[in-house]
Amino acid sequence: MNNCINKFIEKYKPGENLQKPDEEILNFGRQMLPKEIIELWEEYGFGEYGDGLLKVVDPREYMNSLYTWLGQKDFNKIPIIVTAFGDIFYYRKLDDNENDVSLLNIHYRKIEVCGYSYQEFFEEYILDEDVIKNVLRADLFKQAIKEFGKLDYKEIFFFTPALVLGGGEDIKYVKKGNGAVHHQVLLQIGQ
């Protein structure tokens, strides 16, 4: 496996109940994503990494949500990882030689580029201690696990009231529930 993915695996140990990809998603991925991401899927699978702080996801499960947030379907933008708080990291193929990984932060309704290549994302960005603390909300995640228990595959932690409505990034505002439903709720709030 590629070195950039190895660093990710070392930092975020794969969970026990990972799901192997089917041929349909592998064929799609081979056309749209770098081979290293496909190798991650094949060797380990979809599910929780880093005790659930991150989930490597089957893109089909988050494409509709991502494209709704972005306002259009664009198969050059593929969801690859979701945080425990439901934010989506997605791969963007910009042209034949250029790509990056961006973050859709559903709580603050913003998008930011996280790495100017998928290698930079896996080798630097996602391993950075400030990112782990502030973007992934690792400390709050640990408190939420203690309070609510581990997340099921389709669950996320979220804030009530929503952060865009004045909630806070504090355990007293955290709840646990279905990620797809909460994505839609937050999207509706902003419309």
Please give the residue ranges for each predicted region.
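Low-complexity, flexible helical/coil segments
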Residues: 74, 89-94, 113-123, 137-143
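Compact, glycine/acidic-enriched structural inserts
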Residues: 100-136
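Short alpha-helical interface elements
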Residues: 62-69, 105, 126-128, 146
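An amphipathic alpha-helical core segment
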Residues: 121-174
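A surface-exposed partner-binding patch
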Residues: 1-102, 155-191
